[in-house]
Design a protein with these regions (language model features):
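N-terminal carbohydrate-binding accessory modules
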Residues: 4, 17-68, 98, 102-104
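Bacterial N-terminal signal peptides
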Residues: 5-14
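Conserved, mostly hydrophobic/aromatic
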Residues: 34, 61, 69, 100, ...
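The substrate-binding groove and active-site-proximal loops of carbohydrate-active enzymes
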Residues: 39-50, 74-92, 129-149, 173-184, ...
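Aromatic-lined substrate-binding rim segments of carbohydrate-active enzymes
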Residues: 54-120, 192-203
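Aromatic- and acidic-residue-enriched segments that line the glycan-binding/catalytic groove
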Residues: 83-91, 101-102, 113-138, 152, ...
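Catalytic-core region of carbohydrate-active enzymes that cleave or remodel glycosidic bonds
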Residues: 101, 105, 197-198, 202, ...
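Active-site neighborhood of glycoside hydrolase catalytic domains
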Residues: 142-221
Length: 310
């Protein structure tokens, strides 16, 4: 752990969030106010942290040397009953993002609709299944109408906190690892358009996936980022991206620091040295990353989700 803190602190620079800054994609790098910027993000999930501990966890992420937080927005947390939205208390995503800004951290928002995250139904509300013929994560009219209604509510909470408006939000994700599920580019494009109509039309949009999946669902007008874990050959992971987009910034949007436990199986562990070595290599090469997870938190109530049907 001391090794990890030391390495991350080496990259620590002043990251106060300034009013009306710019965050753009340059030739091979991200640009913050026109200058090269490497993202060092901590993935944390606000529903897995009691609200009284939010600020303390955020401060711990910054103490690691992180300059950003990466957060999913969980649809089924905020709309547990159809048409009834809750962004209060432990669901107050605006307050969470404001706390990040208070401590000089940027924010990457990932509003789904599907988030995976080993969460109940991947973040999709249970009540969608009351319509027996619904097609989830497709251009099903019922699904898309309710998806847009939710994303507009997210926009009401967060759209005025993007970096061009003086807030800390630098990027917003479209869908989540969709190439592992389907190949419907038209659906991904429809979700992108919903995000833009939710007032995220001036912030950088991106999609994440495994390196083998972008030819299935990658959109030309979105930034592409990779997901992989400790022990991966980092050059190999980015090789295909380099072939498809040689001038794109490199970012591992989920650098898996560990793995989830499954019921009845031994506790999963990973070699911390491999994680540290991977982080060091990415920092040495100017590759941006989000450490997934930096703080795992706790699955309260019934929110833990299954990854397999068995």
């Amino acid at each position: 752990m001391k090794r990890l803190v030391f390495i991350l602190l080496l990259s620590l620079t002043g990251f106060a969030v300034h009013a009306q800054s710019t965050f753009t994609v340059g030739d091979g790098s991200f640009l913050l106010d026109g200058k090269p910027f490497a993202i060092r993000a901590a993935e944390v999930h606000y529903p897995r942290i009691p609200q009284p501990y939010w600020e303390q966890r955020i401060r711990m992420c910054k103490a690691l040397g992180m300059n950003a937080l990466c957060i999913y927005i969980f649809w089924n947390v905020h709309e547990q009953r159809e048409g009834e939205f809750d962004f209060t208390g432990g669901n107050d995503i605006r307050a969470f993002v404001r706390l990040a800004q208070k401590h000089g951290l940027y924010v990457i928002v990932r509003p789904g609709p599907y988030v995976c995250a080993e969460w109940e139904m991947g973040g999709l509300p249970w009540w969608l299944l009351k319509k027996r013929d619904i097609r989830l994560r497709e251009q099903d009219s019922y699904f898309m109408e309710r998806l847009e209604r939710f994303e507009r509510k997210v926009g009401e909470q967060l759209a005025d906190l993007t970096i061009d408006k003086g807030g800390p939000i630098i990027m917003v994700q479209v869908e989540n690892e969709y190439g592992s599920y389907g190949e419907d580019k038209a659906y991904v494009a429809a979700v992108r358009d919903v995000i833009r109509r939710s007032d995220f039309d001036r912030v950088q949009l991106f999609q994440c996936d495994w390196s083998s999946n972008f030819t299935k669902n990658g959109l030309d007008d979105l930034l592409w980022t990779m997901n992989f874990g400790t022990g991966a050959n980092i050059d190999d992971e980015f090789r295909r991206l380099g072939e498809l987009r040689p001038h794109s910034p490199k970012m591992c949007s989920e650098f898996w620091s560990g793995w989830f436990d499954e019921w009845g199986r031994p506790h999963e562990t990973r070699d911390s040295h491999l994680m540290v070595d991977g982080l060091r290599e990415m920092m040495d090469k100017g590759i941006s990353f989000s450490l997934y997870m930096t703080h795992g938190g706790t699955n309260w109530s019934h929110w833990a989700g299954a990854n397999t049907p068995g």
